[in-house]
């Protein structure tokens, strides 16, 4: 357990730095992982209130490629909500809350939680009765072990256990 919010904020800043290209801690990432936050991005402020971590980035945060824009958000959400007492995050850029992805214009929740998903796979035919399952794949790359989460969205009538079994049979990892 953390002594206070300062400990959580300090750890959050370290995580953000490790996820930033050229960040002083980006070398802490495992060799099969890469920093995603654009080079030159600054963190103006990090605060924690009611288990919601608020991060205010510089405008360089939006210099992300369209291919990676959602991955950056997913990486931040997944990494920061693993901290004790952090249930969600809010992303601000130059003081304005991010409401949509910069390139695709896809709207994002104002408070991002693990429900946002990570490494998403969509197997849906409509927007009704959509369920979400997150699988954690244990991987070994050059004797470096890690866990890779993959969120599957589905609206099949089969139950979650069957979705998980079918997904594991055709594992992307």
Predicted regions and their residues:
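Bimodal "functional hotspot" detector
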Residues: 1-173
């Amino acid at each position: 357990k953390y002594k206070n919010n300062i400990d959580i904020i300090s750890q959050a800043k370290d995580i953000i730095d490790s996820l930033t290209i050229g960040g002083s801690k980006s070398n802490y990432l495992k060799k099969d992982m890469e920093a995603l936050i654009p080079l030159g991005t600054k963190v103006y402020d990090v605060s924690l209130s009611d288990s919601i971590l608020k991060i205010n980035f510089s405008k360089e945060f939006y210099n992300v490629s369209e291919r990676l824009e959602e991955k950056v958000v997913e990486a931040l959400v997944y990494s920061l909500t693993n901290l004790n007492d952090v249930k969600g995050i809010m992303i601000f850029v130059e003081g304005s809350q991010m409401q949509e992805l910069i390139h695709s214009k896809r709207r994002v929740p104002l408070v991002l939680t693990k429900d946002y998903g990570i490494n998403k796979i969509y197997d849906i035919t409509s927007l009704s009765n959509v369920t979400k399952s997150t699988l954690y794949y244990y991987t070994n790359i050059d004797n470096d072990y890690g866990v890779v989460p993959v969120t599957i969205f589905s609206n099949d009538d089969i139950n979650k256990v069957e979705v998980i079994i079918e997904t594991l049979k055709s594992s992307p990892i």
